[in-house]
Every structure is written in structure tokens, then in C-alpha cells.
């Protein structure tokens, strides 16, 4: 909402202004990943299906292209790529959840579901119930057997 337009020149001006004011450009960077967050990619694919002409979605689509180029000019920024935060609010707004004050709570409960699933998995199957560190579902540990939930 703060950008207000999907014009690439205005989006670039916004990003540069945020950096000059020493404010973060939300929706970019990740502590572990060095490429675009796959969740952000999935959200953009969903946005292209359900709201490609929505003005907010057009803005973040341009932001996704412009911001990494501007952010990568700073040698202190090791990952200028989009993360999961870039599109989530826009998509929630489009489907009707327009009060942004609920977004943090909504995201928190989404994490609870993932953490809960991991705890159940590690306590009932992994390493005889001894538990394991956080793992990424995309990857399969060498000692982990392939299995599917029915």
C-alpha cells in the first residue's frame, strides 16, 4: 500500500528511499536461503492464477523484479531475493482478509501446524522417538525411510 503504483520507476524510487532512510525492505532476504524462497515462488504462482490483475499483486510482481537488483548493489546484503513475506499479505487481502492486524496471528498459527506435524513425526518415527533438529521437508535424511501418510 505504501508504494501505491506498479510503475517500475516508482517502485525503484521507493526501494532506494527505504534504503536511504535505513528502513528494511520487507519481503526480501532469508537467514538460510540464498535464492528466492520456494514459498514465495509458490505464492506468486497462486497470485498469477487468482489475482493477476489486482493492483497490489501487480505492485509486488514489479517489486519482486526491481528490489533484488537494487538490494544487491549493497555488498552487505547477501540475499536480496524474495522471501515468503512478499506476497502473503497481498494474497490474504485479495481473498478477503483485509485487516492487516490479523496477519501476524494468522502466520503464527500456520507455523504452529507445521511445528506440530514435525513434533508428531519425530516423536513417533524419527530416531526411535528421540527427536531430531528442525529439518526441511523438501529434503530426505539419509537414514529416513520414505513413507506416506494415508
Language-model region placement:
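Non-transmembrane, aqueous-exposed alpha-helical and coiled segments at domain scale
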Residues: 1-150
